């Protein structure tokens, strides 16, 4: 479908007028709500700057969502679904104007059972954890143990559950449970079709993952049912090392230690700690200047194991706070990990950008050492230890790059590939050019089922232009598609 800007703008205005009882935003806030952290990439900054929706709507109920979706389908107006806009490569930025469907007011925790919870897509993850950590009352009326999400991004204060599912990968906690796509993490989703008379369908795993990490291009997710982790009192610590190799080997040993209950292990090679110390004054004294730092979260009852591992590798604990102290301060070192590291570093050095990499489990330590030796100070090493989907310990990289040119940035990513390191390119906004790597027929078929007019976040899914060939291949038996419920 071609989207003529003036026609889309008129259609959006008509929809807003006809649904005047909903919360519509049409003033200059629309520009801010049309953006995410795309500017982490100098390439995306050039490509996406200035894009904006024609209006933003903030529905509070499923009926309100249904009314907006039905009206957009009748008028042929594109819809871009938004959580809190904490993505990093334009996931929620509309290429063709239209309506931003902001789900941040659709935010109820629906229920919690031992090990499983269900919530509306717009719930903020910090709020979901806060409610679940209070515990569940059993049949005898006693308060049971608390629960928490298995993995959250460093933006957990504002990021939504649906946003992580639609635009994210994993995060803090993935050291135990792997990425969100690991079997057992997402158990089901309730999704709405984009039609004049929208339909609602429950997808159970594994089909529930067909809408995961595709930027809301192939279905509108209303609710998610996810596996939960036991809530522990987390001790936060920073361990500093003079040697990069010692810091890396310590991080790997701690991450791999089965008897130490942990939630996060992050390696920040020099000079990243110095950049953070400059960017965040409250961090003064928490890291040694010029050092390589490992940020860790372990259960308080595992502190002895942490200290033993620190001594084994010759590290120094330069920061330590109990769970009670973290709660009282309302500050957590989680917000210096994952892409918060990138955000803080760029405050000091605006010439930095980053890449996303995945090492090979079992070879990740050797690969990380080899890449640092090969690329030197041009690439600043930031590693997050996680489990793979299959359960092996590994690490993902969010390396900081001293940007010189698009050509050199692409060369650096290719050097990693040539050394067996997977790259999920964060400098592209097309689904297949990033983590997916290729057209996924199941993703396209799912979009055909849920979004037959192609109104959801148009322009982000390359496979949509190949849908007729994909269906022909499926009919001829050349492609096997996932089984989706009929509706």
What residue spans do the PLM features occupy?
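FAD-binding subdomain of flavoenzyme oxidoreductases
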Residues: 110, 125-126, 133-138, 142-257, ...
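Helix N-cap motif at beta-to-alpha junctions
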Residues: 243-246, 297-304, 360-364, 401-406
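Conserved glycine-rich FAD pyrophosphate-binding loop
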Residues: 3-4, 52, 77, 84, ...
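General beta-strand structural signal in soluble alpha/beta enzymes
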Residues: 24-28, 58-59, 79-83, 101-103, ...
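N-terminal flexible segment immediately upstream of the FAD-binding catalytic core
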Residues: 1-70, 86-116, 272, 277-283, ...
């Amino acid at each position: 479908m071609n989207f003529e800007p003036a026609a889309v703008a008129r259609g959006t205005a008509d929809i807003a007028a006809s649904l005047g009882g909903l919360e519509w935003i049409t003033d200059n806030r629309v520009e801010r709500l049309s953006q995410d952290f795309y500017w982490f990439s100098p390439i995306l900054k050039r490509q996406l700057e200035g894009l904006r929706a024609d209006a933003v709507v903030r529905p509070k109920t499923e009926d309100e969502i249904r009314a907006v979706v039905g009206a957009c389908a009748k008028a042929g107006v594109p819809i871009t679904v938004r959580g809190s806009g904490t993505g990093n490569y334009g996931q929620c930025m509309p290429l063709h104007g239209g309506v931003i469907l902001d789900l941040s007011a659709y935010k109820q925790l629906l229920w919690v059972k031992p090990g499983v919870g269900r919530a509306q897509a717009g719930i903020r993850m910090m709020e979901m954890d806060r409610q679940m950590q209070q515990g569940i009352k059993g049949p005898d009326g006693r308060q049971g143990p608390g629960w928490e999400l298995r993995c959250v991004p460093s933006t957990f204060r504002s990021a939504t559950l649906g946003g992580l599912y639609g635009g994210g990968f994993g995060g803090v906690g993935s050291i135990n449970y792997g990425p969100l796509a690991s079997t057992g993490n997402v158990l089901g989703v309730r999704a709405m079709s984009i039609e004049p008379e929208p339909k609602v369908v429950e997808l159970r795993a594994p089909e529930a993952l067909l809408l995961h990490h595709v930027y809301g291009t192939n279905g509108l997710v209303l609710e998610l049912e996810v596996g939960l982790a036991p809530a522990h009192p987390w001790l936060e610590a920073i361990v500093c090392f003079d040697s990069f190799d010692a810091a890396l080997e310590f991080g790997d040993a701690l991450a791999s230690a089965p008897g130490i209950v942990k939630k996060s292990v992050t390696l920040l090679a020099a000079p990243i700690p110095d950049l953070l110390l400059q960017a965040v004054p409250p961090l003064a004294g928490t890291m040694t200047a010029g050092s390589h730092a490992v940020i860790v979260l372990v259960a308080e009852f595992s502190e002895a194991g942490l200290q033993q591992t620190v001594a084994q590798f010759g590290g120094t604990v330069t920061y330590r706070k109990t769970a009670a102290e973290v709660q009282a301060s309302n500050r957590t070192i989680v917000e210096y990990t994952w892409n918060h590291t990138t955000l803080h570093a760029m405050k000091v050095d605006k010439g930095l950008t980053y890449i996303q990499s995945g090492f090979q489990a079992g070879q990740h330590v050797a690969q990380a050492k080899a890449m640092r030796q090969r690329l030197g100070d041009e690439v600043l090493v930031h590693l997050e230890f996680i489990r793979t989907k299959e359960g092996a310990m590994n690490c993902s990289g969010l390396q900081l790059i001293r940007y010189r040119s698009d050509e050199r940035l692409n060369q650096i990513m290719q050097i990693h590939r040539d050394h067996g390191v997977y790259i999920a390119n964060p400098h592209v906004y097309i689904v297949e050019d990033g983590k997916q790597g290729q057209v996924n027929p199941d993703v396209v078929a799912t979009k055909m089922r849920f979004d037959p007019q192609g109104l959801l976040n148009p322009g982000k899914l390359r496979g949509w232009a190949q849908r007729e060939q994909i269906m022909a291949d499926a009919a001829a038996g050349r492609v096997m598609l996932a089984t989706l419920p009929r509706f």
